[in-house]
Amino acid sequence: MKLMIFTGLFLFAIVSLIEAQAENEKPCLPEYKVCTHAPGNCCSDLVCDCYGRYKSGAQIGRNCFCLQKGVIYKREN
């Protein structure tokens, strides 16, 4: 009986460790990819920049993209 409990706990620990490793190895988001729902997933040389969308002074949405750190983007007319 003790052997069955020990084996079950051991298997549970191994499965938990494998899941934690898989989560840490998620690929990062490359430049210009949407990061609205995953702001911490941009690659290390990028930052998740968010911009609000407005219509008639009211915010209608928000977009976030993985962009280069320290770069300022300006709107073209």
Swiss-Prot record:
Tissues and organs where the protein is expressed, per its UniProt entry: Expressed by the venom gland.
GO molecular function: toxin activity
Signal peptide positions on this chain: 1-20
Location(s), subcellular: Secreted
Prosegment location in residue numbers: 21-26
GO CC terms in record: extracellular region
UniProt keyword Coiled coil, yes or no: no
Organism superkingdom: Eukaryota
Record PTM text: Contains 4 disulfide bonds.
Record keywords, A-Z: Disulfide bond, Secreted, Signal, Toxin
Keyword match Heme: no
Similarity comment: family membership: Belongs to the neurotoxin 19 (CSTX) family. 08 (U8-Lctx) subfamily.
The protein's name: U8-lycotoxin-Ls1m
Species, as recorded: Lycosa singoriensis (Wolf spider)
